A protein has these predicted regions:
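Domain-scale signature associated with acetyltransferase and cell-envelope carbohydrate enzymes
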Residues: 1-160, 176-185
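Short glycine/proline- and charge-enriched loop/turn segments
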Residues: 161-173
């Protein structure tokens, strides 16, 4: 009897052994040690301190410098949180100071653009979690711009509108590509 059939037998069986085995398995799954606040409170605080300390070291020593190397010039006081953004394609990125950028952000440049697509991010800009910025030719985010999580700025669609061209694997056409400019304080 393999593990799957044993599980099914214990879950649906009518015998006392099957019911007892299923109750024991559920008790193990939901089991826990009783909480002792004097012990578990400090352990919880230690867990948070270790996690935050390790995250700080990884962010300052690893992810921020690596991402800065992808920029045209390093950005002052760049704050990456939650990892490193995914950058795809030949996009050129310039960034002002005091930018907060989620590590779960995707920045892509249209592969067939010439010259290379440009993403210009001003000062004091916040870009939220799971935001996608698809740069067709140029996207400008002015100073003090806030972009919520899961936003999508589409400067190009990534495929042609014509079904035959799409099926042939052709790239999107130049008339489908546009600039996106979010002025200051948007």
């Amino acid at each position: 009897m393999n593990a799957t059939s044993l599980r099914q037998w214990a879950k649906t069986g009518d015998s006392a052994t099957a019911r007892m085995l299923w109750r024991a398995a559920k008790a193990l799954r939901y089991g826990s040690v009783p909480c002792i606040p004097a012990i578990h409170g400090p352990l919880y605080a230690l867990n948070g301190a270790l996690k935050n300390g390790f995250g700080f070291i990884v962010r300052t020593v690893w992810t921020t410098p690596l991402f800065q190397s992808r920029l045209e010039q390093p950005a002052e006081r760049l704050y990456l949180y939650g990892g490193m953004p995914l950058v795809l394609g030949p996009v050129k990125i310039s960034m002002g100071s005091d930018v907060r950028l989620s590590g779960h952000t995707t920045i892509s440049g249209k592969p067939t653009s010439h010259p290379a697509p440009r993403l210009e991010i001003g000062n004091n800009v916040g870009i939220g979690w799971q935001t996608t910025i698809a740069v067709g030719s140029r996207i400008v985010l002015g100073d003090n711009v806030r972009i919520a999580g899961r936003a999508f700025l589409a400067g190009y669609p990534g495929h042609p509108l014509d079904a035959a061209d799409r099926a042939a694997g052709k790239p999107c056409t130049s008339n489908q590509t546009g600039d996106i400019i979010l002025e200051k304080d948007v």
